[in-house]
Structures are given as structure tokens and as C-alpha cells.
Amino acid sequence: ANVLIAMDDVDLGSSILEPLKPLRTHLVLADGVLTLRELDARTGQGQLGGTVQLDGRDAQALWTADLHWSGVQLESWVHQKRADNAPPYATGRLNGQARVAGQGKSTAAILGSLRGGVRMQLVNGTISHLAVEAAGLDIAQGLGVLIKGDDALPIQCNVVDLVADQGVLRPRVLVLDTRDSTLWVDGSLSLATEAMDLRVVVTPKDFSPLALRTPVHVRGSFADPSVSLEKSKLGARLGAAAALAFLNPLAALIPLVDVGSSDDAKRGGDDCRALSARIAANPVLQAPRPATK
């Protein structure tokens, strides 16, 4: 089979996500291998492209995907309804790429065996001030934001680099830097069991008398996660030795962040370079060491 496909609207199965409008691809079926080539889709004012392949020649099908996306407006792609005309929790143009593979007789089995990597960056982004203060457990500033009303903090540096192995996603680097705080995430997301075990650490750049600076754990199923504090770290400042775990991976990703001739791309690279230098120079701002069990 050799078919050119053009679809005006592809529903992603969720009322929260914007459909793909339109989607065009070249379907080729030969010798038990189904390939979608030259995939070209639009969503959230951005573009998704790449190749997807399903190889059914073995007892268990092998699924591979090499995808890239750019200019996807997060606030358009993910519907974020908030009361009292508050700004969206997060905005910006999402760029990234995914190269993954999985094997099995069902979608669940393929996801449960997924391996590869995903990289993303949010350009010209903002994040809810209230969300940042809540993640950092800054009670004083959080109350102030509640009283005055939420506002959008510009994101200075945002890098996501996920590694997939046997259906488990782990952040090699997941950092979000604003003028207010730097947020780091480590842990794991299991596509096989649909469970998560994440740790979120926020290092504030300002002084607040009620900032606990306590790592937050998000654990449980995707459908019903629970949030708890890391008791052993309650009230403790992050130590100088904690930074180096994420510093080198962040520095290695900066050339990828800095790709492109646009002012936005250059600014993103400069901001992430500044964050990397600040981590190396100032222990108070350093990244947390990945949790060990």
C-alpha cells in the first residue's frame, strides 16, 4: 500500500487538548512494516512532524517514532480554564523532539517497554506566580499573591531532558528558572504501571520568613497522585555538594537550547548559561542531588 493521507481534524481523545488541524502524512505498507512518513500536523498554532513506524514481522510488533515539534503555543494546545480571569498556569511556545521505541502486542505493552529520549524547551514562556510559590512552600508570598491576585512570571530558562527505559521516564534535567525561584524535578514516571515518584525542589532567590524550602514528593498513580513533604529535609537549606548532579547535564544541553538565529533562541541560551554559571558559583542556588533510596 502507498497512500497519501489528508485529514482536516484529528481528535486527541481529550477535551483538554487541542485537536490536530490538519494532519497530512504518507502511509507505506510493505513486507509487514507500516510507516507514516513525512508526518505534518498543526496544533496550538505550532507544527508537528516526523516519522512513525510499526514493524509487525516478529511475534511482537516493534513501534518506533522520530518526532519533532516547534512553535506549539502551550496555552492554546492545553486548555487551562481559571476563575476570575486569572492568567493561564503556563504559557509559551513549546519546541522539542522525541526518539522512542517500544515492543509488544498491545499499546500498553509498547508503552511499558518504551526506550529512548524526549527533549523540550518552552520559549517566551510564563508560569503562574502562585504555582511557583506553592511548589516552594513559600507561605508568606503565597498568601500575598492570593490577596493581590495571581500574575505571570516570565520563564528565563526551561530545559526538559527525559530518558525512557523499559517504560520508565526519568529526568536527566528538568529545570525551570524565573526571577523569583529555580525549580528542579527528579524521580520517575512509569508508563507500565501508570505511577509516578517525583521530587520537586524550589530554591527561592529572595528572602521570605515562611519559606520552608522543603522538597515535595508527588507519588502514586497518574489518576490519583498524592503530595507530601520530604521530612528529612524540612527547613534545611540545600548544601553545596548537591549541585553537581545536574550541573553538567544542564551545561551539555545549552548548545541544543541555543539553536537558531532568532533573538528568542539566543536569549534562551544566554539565560540557561547564566543559570549554569550561577549554580557553579553560588551553593545556595545549586540544584538538588537526585534522591536515593
Predicted features by range, described:
Residues A252:
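A small-molecule sensor/coupling module
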Residues N248-P249:
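Gly/Ala-rich hydrophobic membrane-inserting helices
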Residues A1-G239, A243, P255-D271:
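Small-residue helix/turn framework positions
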Residues V257-A291:
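Membrane-engaging insertion elements
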